[in-house]
From Swiss-Prot:
<comment type="pathway">
    <text>Sulfur metabolism; hydrogen sulfide biosynthesis; sulfite from sulfate: step 1/3.</text>
</comment>
<comment type="similarity">
    <text>Belongs to the sulfate adenylyltransferase family.</text>
</comment>
<dbReference type="GO" id="GO:0004781">
    <property type="term" value="F:sulfate adenylyltransferase (ATP) activity"/>
</dbReference>
<dbReference type="GO" id="GO:0000103">
    <property type="term" value="P:sulfate assimilation"/>
</dbReference>
<dbReference type="InterPro" id="IPR002650">
    <property type="entry name" value="Sulphate_adenylyltransferase"/>
</dbReference>
<dbReference type="InterPro" id="IPR024951">
    <property type="entry name" value="Sulfurylase_cat_dom"/>
</dbReference>
<dbReference type="InterPro" id="IPR014729">
    <property type="entry name" value="Rossmann-like_a/b/a_fold"/>
</dbReference>
<dbReference type="InterPro" id="IPR015947">
    <property type="entry name" value="PUA-like_sf"/>
</dbReference>
<dbReference type="InterPro" id="IPR020792">
    <property type="entry name" value="SO4_adenylyltransferase_pro"/>
</dbReference>
<dbReference type="GO" id="GO:0005524">
    <property type="term" value="F:ATP binding"/>
</dbReference>
<dbReference type="GO" id="GO:0070814">
    <property type="term" value="P:hydrogen sulfide biosynthetic process"/>
</dbReference>
<dbReference type="Pfam" id="PF14306">
    <property type="entry name" value="PUA_2"/>
</dbReference>
<keyword id="KW-0548">Nucleotidyltransferase</keyword>
<protein>
    <recommendedName>
        <fullName>Sulfate adenylyltransferase</fullName>
        <ecNumber>2.7.7.4</ecNumber>
    </recommendedName>
</protein>
<dbReference type="InterPro" id="IPR025980">
    <property type="entry name" value="ATP-Sase_PUA-like_dom"/>
</dbReference>
<keyword id="KW-0547">Nucleotide-binding</keyword>
<dbReference type="Pfam" id="PF01747">
    <property type="entry name" value="ATP-sulfurylase"/>
</dbReference>
Length: 378
């Protein structure tokens, strides 16, 4: 399979020589839009070249496609307050700043008032304000600004040694001779169930791209710096160094379940992956989505439309009788013999000061997490 970016071309909207002297108006971004700005500019969100215009937004919300017909499952928008929107007009070029520093500009093509109730139900499958993605949606501005962006300044990265743009990951894969690469998305520490499906996938491809999300997440998720230490410990001790590549994904978590799974796959395609692991309740939260709903959503599109192969894994567990990791496909034993692993369960145990058993996670990983969380709390 070729490593063609989504839409056919890897977008590059970076111009650090851009003359800002004549640009007066300014929009202050939140953490989500700031991460999106950079990811649009470096091609992570190809074929998108800016924050969605009304036509693209409505097409994505209603049909999971851009107005051009290209598959795209999540609306990437720039929300502003009504007061800020009143200052901005079609044709304006507006600075985009974060924490007082200008990082880019947007060429305003339009501004529009979204139907947030419809967006919530169509994207998140609920309008329940207790859902973290829905809550965030309604907290943000009520007017959306659409238009192409230019990144005029790259930000300082929290994990510079693990930060790669799509052009760089593609080059790395090529230099290593990898023709097939499987991407793995996570916002959790890697537990034994993750390790099992990653290594099972690695048996069939040339390389694994471990691409943990380090943008904005829920307050009860394990902090990114603690997770990054745990990934390094795990990879150094239990994975072949020449078959795995660790790089961060700086986007915010949307918790949009099935539609975010499609989005995660398309983005990893842009980073150069040919395959993408889709496990149980991918990008889910609480009980809002079915266990395998994300996997089923991929069936709505042809392989040509998606352009990346989903590797669908059933719920894996540790079987006391098998004395090994397994899934319902490979283990005949009763559920009473199964130790169910999940990131939520590991997080809860760690927060409560409990030591998860070795069937949950590698000893070195647990030690790293406990030490990291102590530092975070203190």
């Amino acid at each position: 399979m070729s490593l063609t970016p989504h839409g056919g071309v890897l977008i590059n909207r970076v111009n650090e020589e851009y003359d800002l002297s004549t640009v007066a108006k300014e929009i202050e971004l939140d953490a989500i839009s700031f991460a999106d700005l950079e990811l649009i500019a470096i091609g992570g969100y190809s074929p998108i070249e800016g924050f969605l215009t009304k036509a693209d937004y409505e097409a994505v919300v209603s049909s999971m496609r851009l107005a051009s017909g290209v598959v795209w499952s999540l609306p990437i928008t720039l929300p502003v307050t009504k007061e800020k929107a009143a200052e901005i007009h079609q044709g304006d070029i507006v600075r985009l700043s974060y924490n007082g520093t200008v990082y880019g500009v947007i060429e305003v093509e339009d501004q529009y008032t979204p139907d947030k109730e419809k967006e919530a139900v169509n994207v998140y499958k609920t309008d329940d304000r207790n859902h973290p993605g829905v809550k965030k949606l309604f907290e943000r501005g009520d007017t959306y600004i659409g238009g192409k962006i230019t990144l005029t300044k790259r930000s300082e990265k929290p994990f510079p040694q693990f930060t790669y743009e799509p052009e760089e990951t593609r080059r790395h894969f090529k230099e290593n001779g990898w023709k097939t690469i499987v991407g793995f998305q996570t916002r959790n520490p890697v537990h034994r169930a993750h390790e099992y499906i990653q290594k099972t996938a690695l048996e069939t491809v040339d390389g694994l791209f471990l691409n943990p999300l380090v943008g904005e997440t829920k307050s009860d998720d394990i902090p990114a710096d603690v997770r990054m230490k745990s990934y390094q410990v795990l990879l150094n001790g239990y994975y072949p160094k020449d078959r795995v590549f660790l790089g961060v994904f700086p986007a915010a978590m949307r918790y949009a379940g099935p539609k975010e799974a499609i989005f995660h796959a398309l983005v990893r395609k842009n980073y150069g992956c040919t395959h993408f692991i889709v496990g149980r309740d991918h990008a889910g939260v609480g009980d809002y989505y079915g266990t395998y709903e994300a996997q089923e959503l991929f069936e709505q599109f042809t392989s040509e439309e998606i352009g990346i192969t989903p590797l669908k894994f059933e719920h894996s567990f540790y079987c006391n009788t098998c004395e090994a990791m397994a899934t319902p496909k490979t283990c005949p034993h009763d559920k009473s013999e199964h130790v169910i692993l999940s990131g939520t369960k590991v997080r809860t145990m760690l927060r409560n000061g409990e030591l998860p058993p070795s069937t949950f996670s590698r000893k070195e990983v647990i030690e790293t997490l406990i030490e990291g969380l102590k530092t975070t709390v203190s």
